[in-house]
């Protein structure tokens, strides 16, 4: 039919996505149904197909008009309620009611349990006084191939049935009710679409049969003469035939049969709830419900075409202000978030999904052992940076699966070895911390790296390579022995009573690869996302976050450690926000990532608001310290929105009603945040066990004791230390065999020492610095494989403890 009456006004206004705050997400628990949907404000927002990182629809909603006095769309003009169709399934009943009582729209929303079709069973209830006077329309905004531009819309006829069809490249969408349309139209958004048509005079006057190459919308009036109860279907395919056939195959099955199959599929996952069901006395009904929801959400965020791939969130934060030039959203893989989710499923007794995740990560790993900061589920990078904690997390997951005897026939040895080598070769500073905005020495990154290295060493030793295992443990010891030196200020100013506390990150100063200064009291941190004209540089020792709590989580530091407790006093004074639900914390002071202070969207700068995730992290620490955590659990549960979804951020300022910002309630950032749901699952498991689930016993056994360990310093090309303390073991590393040509007496007695190899492709030479050594260590490299000398000499000064104390005293006096 298309082409006879094309819509005017192309290509339409600039397309946008919808906001990141979702009330629910849903999908079938079957790999054959490769479609995911989201809900917000009573309507379907982004719909994903055929993979979980590909949103294809902006929104799908009903509109109502009497053709004379009013026109409504569900999102703007109704009062909405939402509930689950079944406690254990991600399908929903949504009721949208006219505030004036003229009508209500009841919707049951699921996906076909076996096909790529969204199904919305609809009852249009009309008040007696308005019977026969109201018209019902459906409006769909396709954003095919992850974009609003270059979409095409047309009306298709098949066997006497008309349906709406949208297409772009090889992706096709078909939309129709189980009854029939009485009118159909295709148009350009903002010019000739159905919403614009109805808003003009409350009538559907336009019936255009096509709108090509633009930001388009599909509109159809439901034929209510056939009844006010029907099922609306929206199907996808690789051609119009495939999409249309899928649509009508789904619609020909009684809706209740599809619901029964949909629910039965999700009930197969109930074994993952046993850890809570068997401990009902320890877990409240509310906690049990959110635990169940969290498990299902974690399972739902795994892709079905790429098994094991788990994204961070089915949302696009502040999507209402994002167009085609910002494709990523949070529907991407971050290894950090993914491993958190897989670990939570392990805590729930699921080993199958975490193993799939491990195998997926093994394939996604770069050849050099690193992982991209985030990536599409096919492995293509979105942001190409590398964060060391994201390299470390897969090692920890592999270790947990190994300890749980859950690796089946999969051998993660190469994945673990390559990641381990990357951490040692490219560390010890990270290009970005877990907040993805600053590089240097981060307590949270160091904690993850230390834990991962100890896990890797255990696995290496189990395979018979004790030599490499000991090498890895020694590097972990080096990191552990420097944590406080690198990330603790002795000149704290944020809380007058606490001078010594952990900081967020120490942005070390280097010059041509040489470390100029690793002192956290001398660094200056540049903050991202700051408002133009505002200050953006601060002394590093004035910026704090919660990252140091990861040291306790993994067993590197003891709960109750005085330095940990003092640091908590600082973050409570600087970052804590007491809300009606309970305490919550900001990421760090002067954070600019969040809803702007006037309530509008984050756009390159804003205000960092509290994160419920951090309430859960604090609860994990308090549990480890043996203290009551009820207040934190109740707070987190109070922050949940919709059907129990944790928001990334809650509004931390006074209410701004016209922007829908209310103190302690969700902002327009991501909902749900799967990292937070994973933390909640692990917290409840930890509470039941009275032991932190994430704690790694070999790590705690090594570091949470008073046993002395050798003092180690590491020199490598990307960390050319300038000084070493007498009595220290200096280990010199390189990624290739070398002969170290060196002297400790100003070249009077030069020596040659061949490097010792490891299975990681990293070689080393150890120099035990004599306690009485005074002359600097001087050295250069001969590279036998390349038959060349380095062409540069290096020096490491030797200092003595008394000398160091004196120098520090002089420096302090000078600063005073």
Model features per residue range: what roles?
Residues 2-54, 330-333, 341, 384-404, ...:
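C-terminal capping/lid segments that line or modulate ligand- or cofactor-binding pockets
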Residues 4-96, 174-195, 272-284, 735:
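An extended acidic
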Residues 297-306, 349-372, 411-432, 474-494, ...:
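Long, well-ordered core segments of solenoidal/helical folds
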Residues 126-128, 151-154, 168, 224, ...:
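Aromatic-rich carbohydrate-recognition surfaces in CAZymes
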Residues 69-114, 191-216, 429:
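Extended, loop-rich substrate-binding clefts of extracytoplasmic carbohydrate-active enzymes
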Residues 695-816:
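Glycan-association/targeting regions that enable binding to alpha-glucans and other polysaccharides
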Residues 1-9, 101, 112-119, 123-329, ...:
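Acidic/polar, glycine-enriched structural segments that form the non-catalytic walls/loops
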Residues 148, 161-195, 281, 286-290, ...:
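Extended ligand-binding clefts on enzyme/binding-domain cores
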């Amino acid at each position: 039919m298309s082409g006879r009456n094309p819509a005017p006004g192309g290509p339409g206004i600039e397309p946008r996505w919808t906001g990141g705050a979702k009330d629910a997400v849903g999908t079938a628990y079957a790999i054959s149904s490769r479609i995911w949907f989201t809900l917000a404000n009573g309507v379907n927002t982004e719909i994903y197909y055929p993979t979980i990182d590909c949103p294809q629809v902006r929104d799908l909603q009903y509109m109502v008009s009497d053709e004379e006095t009013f026109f409504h769309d569900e999102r703007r003009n109704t009062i909405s309620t939402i509930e689950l169709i079944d406690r254990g399934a991600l399908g929903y009943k949504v009721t949208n009611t006219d505030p004036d009582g003229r009508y209500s729209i009841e919707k049951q929303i699921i996906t076909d349990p076996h096909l790529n079709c969204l199904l919305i069973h609809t009852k249009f209830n009309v008040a007696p006084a308005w019977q026969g006077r109201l018209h019902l329309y459906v409006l769909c905004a396709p954003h095919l191939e992850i974009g609003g531009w270059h979409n095409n819309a047309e009306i298709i006829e098949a066997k006497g049935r008309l349906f709406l069809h949208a297409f772009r490249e090889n992706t096709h969408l078909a939309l129709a009710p189980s009854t029939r349309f009485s009118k159909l139209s295709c148009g350009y958004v903002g010019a000739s679409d159905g919403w614009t048509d109805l808003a003009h005079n409350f009538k559907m006057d336009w019936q255009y049969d096509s709108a090509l190459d633009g930001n388009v919308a599909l509109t159809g009036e439901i034929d209510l003469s056939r009844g006010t109860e029907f099922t609306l279907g929206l199907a996808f395919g690789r051609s119009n035939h495939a999409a249309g056939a899928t649509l009508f195959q789904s619609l020909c099955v009684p809706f209740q049969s599809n619901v029964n199959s949909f629910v039965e599929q999700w009930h197969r996952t109930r074994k993952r709830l046993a850890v809570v069901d068997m401990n009902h006395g320890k877990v409240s009904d509310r906690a049990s419900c959110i635990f169940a929801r969290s498990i299902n959400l974690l399972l739902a965020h795994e892709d079905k075409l790429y098994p094991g791939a788990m994204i961070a969130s089915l949302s696009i934060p502040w999507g209402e202000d994002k167009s085609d030039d910002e494709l990523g959203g949070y529907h991407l893989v971050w290894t950090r978030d993914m491993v958190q989710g897989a670990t939570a499923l392990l805590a729930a007794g699921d080993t199958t999904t975490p193993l799939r995740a491990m195998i997926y990560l093994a394939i996604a790993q770069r050849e050099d052992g690193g992982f991209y900061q985030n990536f599409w589920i096919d492995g293509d990078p979105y942001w190409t940076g590398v964060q060391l904690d994201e390299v470390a997390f897969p090692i920890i997951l592999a270790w947990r699966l190994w300890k749980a005897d859950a690796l089946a026939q999969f051998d993660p040895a190469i994945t673990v070895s390559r990641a381990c080598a990357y951490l040692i070769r490219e560390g010890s500073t990270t290009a970005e911390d877990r907040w993805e905005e600053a590089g240097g020495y981060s307590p949270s990154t160091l904690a993850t790296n230390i834990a991962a290295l100890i896990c890797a060493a255990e696995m290496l030793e189990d395979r018979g390579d004790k030599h490499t295992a000991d090498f890895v443990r020694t590097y972990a010891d080096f990191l552990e022995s420097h944590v406080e030196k690198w990330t603790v200020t002795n000149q704290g100013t944020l809380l007058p009573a606490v001078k010594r506390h952990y900081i967020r990150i120490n942005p070390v100063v280097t010059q041509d690869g040489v470390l100029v200064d690793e002192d956290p009291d001398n660094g200056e941190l540049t903050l991202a996302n700051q408002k133009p004209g505002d200050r953006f540089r601060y002394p590093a020792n004035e910026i704090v976050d919660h990252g140091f709590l990861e040291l306790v989580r993994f067993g590197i530091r003891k709960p109750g450690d005085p330095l940990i407790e003092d640091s908590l006093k600082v973050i409570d004074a600087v970052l804590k926000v007491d809300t009606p639900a309970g305490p919550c914390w900001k990421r760090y002071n002067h954070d600019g990532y969040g809803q702007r202070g006037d309530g509008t969207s984050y756009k390159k700068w804003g205000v960092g608001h509290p994160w419920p995730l951090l309430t859960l992290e604090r609860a994990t620490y308090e549990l480890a310290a043996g203290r009551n955590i009820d207040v934190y659990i109740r707070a987190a549960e109070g922050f949940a929105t919709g059907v129990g979804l944790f928001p990334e951020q809650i509004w931390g300022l006074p209410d701004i009603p016209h922007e829908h910002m209310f103190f302690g309630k969700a902002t327009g950032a991501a909902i749900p945040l799967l990292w937070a749901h994973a933390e909640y699952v692990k917290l409840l498991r930890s509470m039941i066990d009275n032991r932190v689930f994430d704690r790694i016993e070999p790590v705690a056994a090594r570091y949470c004791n008073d046993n002395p360990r050798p003092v180690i310093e590491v020199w490598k090309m990307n960390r050319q230390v300038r000084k070493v303390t007498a009595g220290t073991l200096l280990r010199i590393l390189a990624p290739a065999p070398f002969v170290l040509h060196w002297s400790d007496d100003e070249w009077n007695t030069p020596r040659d020492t061949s490097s010792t190899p490891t299975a990681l492709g990293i070689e080393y030479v150890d120099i035990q610095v004599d306690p009485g050594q005074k002359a600097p260590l001087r050295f250069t490299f001969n590279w036998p494989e390349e038959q060349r000398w380095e062409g540069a000499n290096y020096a490491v000064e030797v200092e003595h403890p008394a000398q160091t104390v004196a120098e520090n005293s002089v420096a302090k006096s000078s600063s005073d």
